[in-house]
Amino acid sequence: MLEGLKEALEHVEELARENEKTEVVEICGHTYANKALRRYDTANYAEPVKATTLSALADYIVNCREEFTEDRRMIIHVVSPTKVRLMSALDGERKREVLFETDAQVSGFRFDQWYDQESFMIGLQANFAKTADLDAVLLLAGNIERKNEQTYSDDGCTQVATMTVGVAAKADAIVPNPVQLRPYRTFQEVEQPVSQFVFRIGDRGTPEFKLVEAEGGIWKTEAVRKIKDYLELVLSEQDMALRNRITIIG
């Protein structure tokens, strides 16, 4: 009985050893293994420097150029209106090393959501660059008052609301639509793209307001172009050797 148990344990050990073996086969010119393998001689890549501004990236390129050697080409990738990366060209491992990454701190304004009067006024002043249309919206929203017997007039294209025009006088005012505004949606170093928004006034007991984007995200393309223009200007002020090593894409 003990002899049989010993043989069984030896058989289990043998199966375990067989299972630990890695089998490598070649099929149609491609090499495969029956286990996931991990290389021990992989290249070491640096952790990217993190920032929130384009000027920080510009400072890094100008002042830390020794971190990317002269024989190493670099790419500035404008990923989106809020993210830019500085990375190397493909290395021998067919990988790219990201040296710098910057993420813009942008407006927290919630489009297509209702705001009460005070929150709307604060949100506009904190999250939008000044424009004539912004002043018009602020003026109207700040002077709207509740109607007791009449709802806001709305024909689908324009709205009419009562606003105060003096100490006690009131007048009907046409709500401007669409309005052209510049919310803070990309890096502060570039001009904020202008976009069209539909300005709506709600009538659920107290005045409420919202802005609805009305151009399908066209501003993103403009923002990326402005970021590229800014970075190209930075590079144009550097020596030819540095300019020739860096490509900007976006």
Predicted regions, residues:
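Amphipathic, membrane-active segments
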Residues: 46, 50-109, 150-208
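Alpha-helix boundary/N-cap detector
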Residues: 3, 48, 52, 111-115, ...
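Generic N-terminal initiation segments characterized by hydrophobic and/or small/turn-forming residues
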Residues: 2, 6, 51-54, 71, ...
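Membrane-inserting effector segments that mediate pore formation, membrane fusion
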Residues: 110-160
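Surface-exposed polar/charged interaction patches
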Residues: 15-18, 43, 60-67, 126-131, ...
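An N-terminally focused, membrane-permeabilizing/fusogenic/translocator signature enriched
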Residues: 1-85, 241-250
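Charged, low-complexity surface segments at secondary-structure and domain boundaries
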Residues: 39-46, 104-109, 126, 212-217
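Long, compositionally biased interface segments
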Residues: 190-250
